[in-house]
Amino acid sequence: MNYLKNIFYWSKLNYDEQQKILSRPILNRNHTVKDTVKKVIENVKNFGDNALRKYSILFDKFNVNEFRIPEEKIISSFLNINENLKSSILIAKKNITSFHEAQILSTIDIETQIGVRCQQVYLPLNSVGIYIPNGTTSLFSSVLMLAIPAKIAGCKEIILCSPPPINNNILYASYVCGIKKIFQVGGAQAIAALAFGTETI
């Protein structure tokens, strides 16, 4: 399948043609997307899990019985991953960890003059929510790139949302990162659930 339907050679275009390409018309359309997202957020705030179920069917074409993935399924995800991929995920985890550990900043505590103490202290959030897209390609590397810095920062709880059904690669990457709360919910409804909470999330 050819995804590059239109190829433009920038140097051969005049100014008006260049501006037209840069205008990104999909973002300049009417407010339909913005209005839809606003409605989704309001419905999740007001109707919780019922709204999540409705939007899973509407947007993901998936009827979710249980949003939370059982911990046993997360742990056993390694059974469905080939050894090369497991190895690659573990190497990536090590590399990402090394990179982010090198960025840890020291606490600053100085006395600028007698009786005046100035501090710069870094405190982690208690819990963070991360969203992992799960469309035509499983973006399990995003799990590593989001969860590892949160762990290093000292976040006690990481909650992951991803559209249903969640790919085993995402589950395995989550397991490797120590994520125990995984919910199969996608889109704006997932972000709203993470922000405002529902009966389940």
Swiss-Prot record:
Binds 1 zinc ion per subunit. The keyword Zinc applies. GO terms for cellular component: cytosol. Keywords: Amino-acid biosynthesis, Histidine biosynthesis, Metal-binding, NAD, Oxidoreductase, Zinc. GO terms for biological process: L-histidine biosynthetic process. Its cofactor is Zn(2+). PANTHER family: HISTIDINE BIOSYNTHESIS TRIFUNCTIONAL PROTEIN, HISTIDINOL DEHYDROGENASE HDH. Homodimer. Belongs to the histidinol dehydrogenase family. This is Histidinol dehydrogenase.
